């Protein structure tokens, strides 16, 4: 029997928020390199551990993923390892069985850029590699609107259909072909995946080109490459509809008591919807069947060990006995550590330290200490780099160097500005830490929401340059404003401040007399930051701490629902924002000048639910649709404001009220049916909801604070600043450089490699003085005015630019153009 080895438990990190992934290789668990996260071989099985910080402790989700071509032995090993890992963690984890192509939304949400299925597996010698691999030739079929899944398919036009998006990956060139019937959201998600492959696997050096299926004639070079690789285009198949599940099926619930008396599986129905928590006896194990769409296994804390260990295998036996699909999702719950998804299936559910219903047990006069999670070097030196999305490799006490991008170059940030990040800037943070004698580095590329396109491009280029300086060894982490990972916050020890606009460069900061409001979020020095929000009362939230800086004072405002930990961190970060004395203002006891500074007192997010530190039913966001004539709701896990697409409608369920958010581009029938759709949601909810629950219809741009309060750092200008699909497509680069790559491809019979020439043929050379500062009309016949540099001899080229042609070709386009202008060859 397989057992969780000390090699695995020794490296397993129980206190770092993020994910860790292992592949089953020869029946052993082998860590997957961080840069390969999101890539899964169809012939293999994987185990994924997700760790989250919850209050004073941690919650865990363990998923075992089964590739469609994996062996029964590997599948069994993955299941056993999952059970053993749960026991190692104290039997508090939620276990999930994931089957390729049928993964849960929770699993897919770990990979925001997309999930890629790769052909082969460990048995055929397939390895998870790091970056800079150009010897690639594959066709990816991309599906999904929110959480994208891409599968490797046969390199043929037969694989295409009119309704989906496909990526032809040729190493240095990635071609995105958009089916004529695919929508903008699908095209945008596929483009994000293509960019992620370019940046994560090719260090930003590959080119991405897009072909619109309804207008292929507009991209002749890319179509030339497609036909060169795939052959002459054949008739494309019709669109295949995405699998959709009727909400009514989700609401069909049956609870079973399962035992294997006399060696036979005995299934006894206990109850149907509505279900209540007291139906679950602590001495037993149960199966909750959600109409065959998903199976939940609940293990009572006092059930015998054998029953607990057999829970997953019993669920699989139940699926077989019911003739359900083998791909049916299975989730295993431990008594007292149930997932929110499981709890919301019951009409009534209470957790320890909470009163029944929506009330909250509050402790008066108790001040919580700032919790310190131990990531000291003594503990960490025996652990390799933790496979976690948030890169929490240590306690942040290593050496950090910070630069700001200025005029496309790096300028060191003064010590007094460390931890201050301005929305008009881009920054590079080089973090150095040691594991024993070995030096390790992480490069964080922080990109402000209002930084220029040139600065965004320069930050990526400078990161590659810095990476090369250290032999391509550092881990690169791109951080968009508002999505700062825990380790980046830990580097600044809870003193990270993010400003909406402005710059820390000379003359770029706003006057010290300006009034600013900061939303402080975090409970310890590893997860705290202050985020600037609009200076108005509506920005406040009863659940958090805020810092209001005025020309004459600086207020520290404590909402009624904030914890002692949050108050302590609020004090710490406030000292960074202002050196003046900070009067503490408790919610409800604000002096008149406080409201004057905010432009007057108005309503803000202050509902009783917001004051609960640990609500038993967390808010849930669903993307809604009635396009098929029936109500469909797709849950968005770990939602943020960025998940709200202005062309769609969404339902935010906070249990005691339902919000229906309507984007400006939503269709008329969805707008008209808003209240009715929300009522249908309540009627079909498996938890037998109160049909009198208030339903609030919210229009984009007119959101009340009771809605925005459920989103971290709500930005009213979010959609006006958001780039369109066409704008993002235009940023991919010019067609000339792609044309050169296509010429290089079609003139050869081989796949692109890192050494593929970017110039298709040898052009006629001319003396330097004939080309420099010469107008197009005065150039000799045969000279391409846009490519003067390619008419230089190799010696002249190196003398002028101080580098070889290949080094020049690896520079970003803006850098190439600047050099050409400087040398008179533009």
UniProtKB/Swiss-Prot annotation:
User: What stretches of residues are Gelsolin-like repeats?
Assistant: 27-76, 148-188, 265-309, 408-457, 528-568, 631-672
What SMART domains is this protein classified in?
Answer: GEL, VHP
Where is the segment annotated Core? 1-734
Locate the region Headpiece. Answer: 735-826
| Keywords, sorted A to Z | Actin capping, Actin-binding, Calcium, Cell projection, Cytoplasm, Cytoskeleton, Repeat
Q: Which Pfam families match?
A: Gelsolin, VHP
Binding-site list for a 1,2-diacyl-sn-glycero-3-phospho-(1D-myo-inositol-4,5-bisphosphate): 112-119, 138-146
Outcome recorded upon mutating residue 144 to A: Reduces the actin-severing activity. Does not affect actin-capping activity
What effect on the protein does mutating residue 814 to A have, as reported in its record?
A: Loss of F-actin binding
The family line of this record is: Belongs to the villin/gelsolin family.
Q: How does it assemble?
A: Monomer. Homodimer. Associates with F-actin; the association with F-actin is inhibited by tropomyosin.
Q: What is this protein called?
A: Villin-1
- Source species, please? Gallus gallus
Starting at the broadest rank, the lineage of the source organism is: Eukaryota, Metazoa, Chordata, Craniata, Vertebrata
């Amino acid at each position: 029997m397989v057992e969780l080895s000390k090699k695995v438990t020794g490296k397993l990190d129980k206190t770092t928020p993020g994910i860790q992934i292992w592949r089953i290789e020869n029946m052993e668990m082998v860590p997957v390199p961080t840069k390969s996260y999101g890539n899964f071989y169809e012939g293999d099985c994987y185990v994924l551990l997700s760790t989250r910080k919850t209050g004073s402790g941690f919650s865990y989700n363990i998923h075992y993923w089964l590739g469609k071509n994996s062996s029964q032995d590997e599948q069994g090993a993955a299941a056993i390892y999952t059970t053993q890992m749960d026991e190692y963690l104290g039997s508090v984890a939620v276990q999930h069985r994931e089957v390729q192509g049928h993964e849960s939304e929770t699993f897919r949400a770990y990979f925001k850029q997309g999930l890629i299925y790769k052909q082969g597996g460990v048995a055929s010698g397939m390895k998870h590699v790091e970056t800079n691999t150009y010897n690639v030739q594959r066709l990816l079929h991309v599906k999904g609107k929110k959480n994208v899944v891409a599968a490797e398919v046969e390199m043929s036009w037969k694989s295409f259909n009119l309704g989906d998006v496909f990526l032809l990956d040729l190493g240095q060139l990635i071609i995105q072909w958009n089916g004529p019937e695919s929508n903008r959201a699908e095209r945008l998600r596929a483009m994000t995946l293509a960019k992620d492959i370019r940046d994560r696997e090719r260090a930003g050096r590959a080119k991405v080109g897009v072909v619109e299926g309804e207008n292929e004639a507009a991209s002749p070079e890319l179509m030339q490459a497609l036909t060169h690789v795939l052959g002459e285009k054949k008739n494309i198949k019709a669109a295949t509809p995405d699998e959709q599940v009727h909400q009514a099926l989700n609401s069909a619930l049956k609870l079973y008591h399962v035992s294997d008396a006399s060696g036979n599986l005995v299934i006894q129905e206990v109850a149907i919807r509505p279900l209540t928590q007291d139906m679950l006896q602590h001495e037993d194990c149960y199966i909750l069947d959600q109409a065959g769409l998903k199976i939940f296994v609940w293990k009572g804390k006092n059930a015998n060990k054998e029953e607990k260990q057999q829970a997953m295998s019993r669920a699989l036996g139940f699926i077989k006995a019911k003739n359900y699909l083998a791909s049916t999702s299975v989730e295993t719950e431990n008594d007292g550590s149930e997932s929110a998804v499981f709890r919301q299936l019951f009409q009534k559910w209470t957790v320890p330290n909470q009163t029944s219903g929506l009330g909250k047990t509050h402790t008066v006069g108790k001040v919580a200490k700032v919790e310190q999670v131990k990531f000291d070097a003594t503990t960490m030196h025996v652990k390799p780099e933790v496979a976690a999305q948030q890169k929490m490799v240590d306690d942040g006490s290593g050496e950090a160097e910070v630069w700001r991008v200025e005029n496309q170059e790096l300028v060191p940030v003064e010590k007094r500005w460390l931890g201050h990040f301005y929305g008009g800037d881009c920054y590079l943070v080089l973090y150095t830490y040691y594991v024993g004698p070995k030096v390790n580095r992480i490069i964080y590329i922080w990109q402000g929401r209002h930084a220029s396109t040139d600065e965004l491009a320069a930050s990526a280029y400078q990161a590659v340059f810095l990476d090369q300086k250290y032999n391509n060894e550092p881990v690169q982490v791109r951080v968009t404003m508002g999505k700062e990972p825990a380790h980046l916050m830990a580097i600044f020890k809870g003193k990270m401040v993010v400003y909406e606009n402005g710059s820390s460069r000379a003359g770029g900061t706003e006057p010290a007399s300006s009034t600013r409001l900061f939303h402080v979020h975090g409970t310890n020095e590893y997860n705290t930051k202050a985020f600037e929000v609009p200076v108005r009362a509506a920005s406040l939230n009863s659940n958090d701490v805020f810092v209001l800086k005025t020309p004459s004072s600086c207020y520290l405002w404590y909402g009624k629902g904030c914890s002692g930990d949050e108050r302590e961190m609020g004090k710490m970060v406030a000292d960074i924002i202002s050196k003046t004395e900070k009067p503490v203002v408790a919610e409800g006891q604000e002096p008149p000048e406080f409201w004057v500074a905010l432009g007057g007192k108005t309503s803000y997010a202050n509902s009783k639910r917001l004051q609960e530190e640990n609500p038993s039913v967390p808010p849930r966001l669903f993307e809604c649709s009635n396009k098929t004539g029936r109500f469909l709701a797709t849950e968005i896990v770990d939602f943020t404001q960025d998940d709200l697409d202005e062309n769609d409608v969404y339902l935010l369920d906070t249990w005691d009220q339902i919000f229906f958010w309507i984007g400006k581009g939503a269709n008329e029938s969805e707008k008209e049916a808003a209240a009715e759709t929300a009522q249908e949601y309540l009627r079909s909810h498996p938890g037998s909801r109160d049909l009198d629950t208030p339903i609030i219809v919210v229009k984009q741009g007119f959101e009340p604070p009771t809605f925005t309060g459920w989103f971290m750092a709500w930005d009213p200008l979010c959609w006006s600043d958001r780039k369109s699909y066409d704008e993002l497509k235009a940023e991919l680069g010019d067609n000339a450089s792609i044309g050169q790559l296509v010429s290089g491809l079609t003139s050869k019979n081989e796949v692109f490699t890192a050494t593929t020439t970017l110039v298709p043929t040898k052009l006629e050379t001319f003396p330097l003085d004939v080309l420099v500062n010469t107008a197009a009309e005065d150039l000799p016949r045969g000279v391409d005015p846009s490519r003067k540099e390619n008419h230089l001899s190799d010696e002249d080229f190196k003398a002028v630019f101080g580098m070889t042609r290949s080094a020049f070709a690896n520079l970003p386009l803006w850098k190439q153009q600047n050099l050409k202008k400087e040398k008179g060859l533009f």
